[in-house]
Curated annotation (Swiss-Prot):
Name of the protein in question: Hexokinase-3
Gene: Hk3
Region (Hexokinase small subdomain 2): 531-662
Chain intervals for the UniProt region annotation (Disordered): 1-27
Binding site for D-glucose 6-phosphate 2: 542-546, 664, 687, 868-870, 904
Organism: Rattus norvegicus
Length: 924
């Protein structure tokens, strides 16, 4: 496009060489005008291509790819949360660079309520030219003096005033309060500032001033301020969009996707810096000759090409270039371009906005053009208005394509079928232009139909928005401190775990010697573990709840085959007479034998009986009390093996050889011991927790004999009932204990097992909610409900992908409304509770394996532990944490953990077979 030189006339003057008014337009002029306007038409395909290209560039930048170099920067702003309406307090804002040669100081009061949520007062200070061009220290000292002067006018307490700094110059931000100036713009040329942390320079100046105690909390750009400053609605505002002199957007990205952060959890606000976007294949086809001319005339040709098609600084200039071209071709103004029209930047954004107004636009066209020394005809005014519409429509559509890329990014990264989000809008193009937002909305709906978007005008992003960033940062810091203080008692040191290990060793020794101890150390009369030679067919019974299992276990060389049948125990049987219960059990056994073709055979039988018993022999167990909803009369205080044998006798013609009554923990050890002869410990971590191990018989005071081994049922859930664990207990443990059916008992179990961990978490969440840290401080009935937070939720939450989707789903199903910060904190609470549980369990295992090693006088011990229980098996980190703790506390022991397969069935059968083997050996 040919360069156009101004003729040197003043605005308002007309060139005397211009053709006379009223001369008709040359033929074909309307077609020529249409041709020029057509250049600004952007097709849906082109918009989709721009959307895809920008999205690709965004993702490249997020990943830190530099080849090919992405055309957008995707800068982390270190703003990690959006407002949730409870922010309150007084905040200072210093705004420098947003309004040219002046700075603004604001006092913003946030009330934390929906009504009158924000109150502000402000003062503007003109920056002298010698300060703008002087030393950097002089500028920041001036800013500090302005802060003091502003505060002097109001009665404020000089106690840690929180300040947000809006510094509108290109910076490299490395933290919320760390930002290095890249280069000055907007006429500022202060020496000694470029390459320096401007937040620190401001802090130093405030300290030199020495008048007020001001804490600079956050450095914020105007786009982020726009997002943070919008009114709270029914959906989260997680996108900020500025179309002012320039254009930019920011949004809340998953932190794990931002390579520059190297973080896994939470979100961070990313400033896209999309004004620099350029892709020849996508953007090239929509660039016009007028865009090229504008770029050539700009201060930095070739840069910010996308911004130069959208930003308010350029829209008026694009309109001017089109009008000049049309006039030079005789289409407008009788072929006459006035000197003012030929002058760069003579048409501004405010002119374009007024001329395009549907109601008063034509009148404004005449006013603006006459001010440029032109005398437009009616047809000229109409065409000028069409030019304005074409330029601005394209700008809105291009902006929409970029916004659609951001929305698509949000939707796909969060794996949401429909994204519901609010976009905060700010800038004079939105404020002044009547149609820009309408076109933007319509185009976004076409380009991102899967996104449900509401647009909310931001109120004073540079002031209120910066204050809100500061308030949110202060809130997060306070909440983080409270969370850490709350969870600190759950962070067990190596010294604490070593103490637990030592206390358990002492309790084990006292229990074995028959002295007073919280560990009962019960002999199980299982004297050996499998040696791999076990063969044969066995029956096993498993009674531990409302379902009862009968199993046929076939042990062959290298394999164990299990066939089982589940039978229900009706409530009237479970709570009727003992005779009726055991008759029902025998009926089930007989039915199973018929189904398996075993009628008339007398197979050795092992009985897993998961109720509290005092065992007097391998086949003698006195029921202490019923649990789990059973209350059959005439059983407590009786030998349950005897009751079973009596039921068999009553049935007649049934031959069953009851060899052993088996505890489920022992069954777990024996089940794993068949595959690994080194397995000498059993561990259950499920609804409850317990452990057993092979002790030297000489150490068991209650059983005569000096040689051989005896499996000891530790009943370690009661460890600490003597008060030895009181130093580890928290107020949350105390609340759970007091609400339990057995206050003061099973203290170790209540800190470890699945029955209680969810309740501990629930009490912590209640506490944090009461302090306003979680769920906006809003207490809900669901959190007040006992056992509403299932322990399985811990496994699901801690198994969650990095997006914390499972956390949100679980809590929302419970009726809780939460933010991403809430989800992250709930995850941390779950991790703290389950980590402590695993570490305590590990300390217990370490005590046992060290006891085995010292019993045998070994320098090094290699031993395996058979493990069962839903918490151990299903929790994603529990088993690893147990193993790590054991390695730290028992470094001389090499411990392998084996997950048991059907300890109640296979284990009971193996106990039975080992007992038979030992009996046969004794006979020989």
């Amino acid at each position: 496009m040919a360069a156009i030189e101004p003729s040197g006339l003043h605005p308002g003057e007309r060139d005397s060489s211009c053709p006379q008014e009223g001369i008709p337009r040359p033929s074909g002029s309307l077609e020529l005008a249409q041709e020029y306007l057509q250049q600004f038409k952007v097709t849906m395909t082109q918009l989709q291509q721009i959307q895809a290209s920008l999205l690709c560039s965004m993702e490249q930048a997020l990943k830190g790819q530099d080849s090919p170099a992405p055309s957008v920067r995707m800068l982390p702003t270190y703003v990690r949360s959006t407002p949730h309406g409870t922010e309150q307090g007084d905040f200072l804002v210093l705004e420098l660079g947003a309004t040219g040669a002046s700075l603004r100081v604001l006092w913003v009061t946030l009330t934390g309520t929906k009504e009158h949520s924000v109150e502000t007062r402000s003062q503007e200070f003109v920056i002298p030219q010698e300060v703008i061009l002087g030393a950097g220290q002089q500028l920041f000292d001036f800013a500090a003096r302005c802060l003091s002067e502003f505060l002097d006018a109001y009665p404020v307490e000089n106690q840690g005033l929180k300040l947000g700094f809006n510094f509108s110059f290109p910076c490299h931000q490395t933290g919320l309060d760390k930002s290095t100036l890249i280069s000055w713009t907007k006429g500022f040329r202060c020496s000694g500032v470029e390459g320096q942390d401007v937040v620190q320079l401001l802090r130093d100046a405030i300290q030199r001033q020495g008048t007020y105690n001001i804490d600079v909390v956050a450095m914020v750009n105007d786009t982020v301020g726009t997002m943070m400053g919008c009114e709270l609605g029914t959906r989260p505002c997680e996108v900020g969009l500025i179309v002012d002199t320039g254009t930019n957007a920011c949004y809340m990205e998953e932190a794990r996707h931002v390579a520059a952060l190297d973080e896994d959890r939470g979100r961070t606000c990313v400033s896209i810096e999309w004004g620099s976007f350029y892709d020849e294949e996508a953007l090239g086809p929509v660039l016009t000759t007028f865009d090229d001319a504008l770029d050539h005339e700009s201060l930095v040709p070739g840069a910010q090409r996308f911004e130069k098609m959208i930003g308010g600084l350029y829209l008026g200039e694009l309109v001017r270039l089109v009008l000049v071209h049309l006039s030079q071709h005789g289409v407008l103004f009788g072929g006459c371009a006035s000197p003012a029209l030929l002058s760069q930047n003579s048409i501004l954004l405010e002119h374009v906005a007024k001329m395009e107004d549907p109601a008063t636009g034509i009148a404004h066209v005449h006013t603006v053009l006459q001010g440029l020394g032109l005398s437009p005809q009616a047809s000229d005014a109409e065409l000028v208005q069409r030019v304005c519409m074409a330029v601005c429509t394209r700008a809105a559509q291009l902006c929409a394509s970029a916004l659609a890329a951001v929305l698509s990014r949000l939707q796909h990264s969060r794996e949401q079928q429909t994204l519901h989000v609010a976009v905060a809008t700010g800038g004079r193009v939105f404020e002044w232009h009547p149609r820009f937002l309408c076109i933007l909305k319509e185009t976004v709906m076409l380009l991102a139909p899967e996104c449900d978007v509401s647009f909310i005008p931001s109120v004073d992003g540079g002031g209120r928005g910066v204050a809100m960033v500061t308030a949110v940062a202060a809130r997060l810091a306070t909440h983080r401190r409270i969370l850490e203080e709350t969870l600190a008692p759950f962070q067990l040191s190596l010294e604490q775990l070593t103490a637990v290990q030592a206390q358990m060793r002492e309790a084990m020794i006292r229990g074995l010697q028959g002295e007073s101890s919280s560990l009962r150390m019960l002999p199980t009369y299982v004297r050996a573990t499998p040696d791999g030679s076990e063969r044969g067919d066995f029956l096993a019974l498993d009674l531990g709840g409302t379902n009862f299992r009968v199993l046929l276990v076939r042990v062959a060389e290298g394999s164990v085959q299990i066939t089982n049948q589940v039978y229900s125990i009706p409530e009237y049987v479970a709570q009727g007479s003992g005779q009726k219960l055991f008759d029902h059990i025998v009926d089930c056994i007989v039915d199973f034998q018929k189904r398996q073709g075993l009628s008339g055979q007398s197979l050795p039988l092992g009985f897993t009986f998961s109720f509290p018993c005092k065992q007097l022999g391998l086949d003698q167990g006195i029921l202490l009390n019923w649990t789990k909803g059973f209350n059959a009369s005439g059983c407590e205080g009786q030998d349950v093996v005897y009751l079973l044998r009596e039921a068999i006798r009553r049935r007649q013609a049934v031959e069953l050889n009851v060899v052993a009554i088996v505890n489920d923990t022992v069954g777990t050890m024996m089940s794993c011991g068949y595959d690994d002869p080194c397995c000498e410990m059993g561990l259950i971590v499920g609804t409850g927790t317990n452990a057993c191990y092979m002790e030297e018989l000489r150490n068991v005071a209650s059983v005569p004999g000096d040689s051989g081994h005896m499996c000891i049922n530790m009943e370690w859930g009661a460890f600490g009932d003597d008060g030895s664990l009181s130093m580890l207990g928290t107020c949350f443990d105390a609340s759970v204990d007091q609400a339990s059916i057995n206050p003061g008992k099973q203290r170790f179990e209540k800190m470890i097992s699945g029955m209680y961990l969810g309740e501990i978490v629930r009490h912590i969440l209640l506490h944090l909610t009461s302090l306003g840290v979680l769920f906006r401080g809003q207490k809900t009935q669901c959190l007040q409900t006992r056992d509403i937070f299932k322990t399985k939720f811990l496994s699901e939450i801690e198994s969650d992908s990095l997006a914390l989707r499972q956390v949100r789903a679980i809590l929302e199903d419970l009726g809780l409304t939460l933010t991403s910060d809430d989800a992250l904190m709930v995850l941390e609470v779950c991790q703290a509770v389950s980590r402590r549980a695993a570490q305590l369990c590990g300390a217990g295992v370490a005590a046992v394996v060290e006891k085995i090693r010292e019993n045998r006088g070994l320098q090094e011990l290699t031993v395996s532990v058979g493990v069962d229980g839903t918490l151990y098996k299903l929790h994603p980190h529990f088993s690893r944490l147990v193993s790590v703790t054991v390695r730290k506390l028992a470094p001389q022991c090499t411990v392998t953990f084996l997950q048991s397969e059907d300890g109640s069935g296979k284990g009971a059968a193996l106990v039975t077979r080992v007992a038979c083997r030992l009996t046969q050996m004794a006979c020989v």
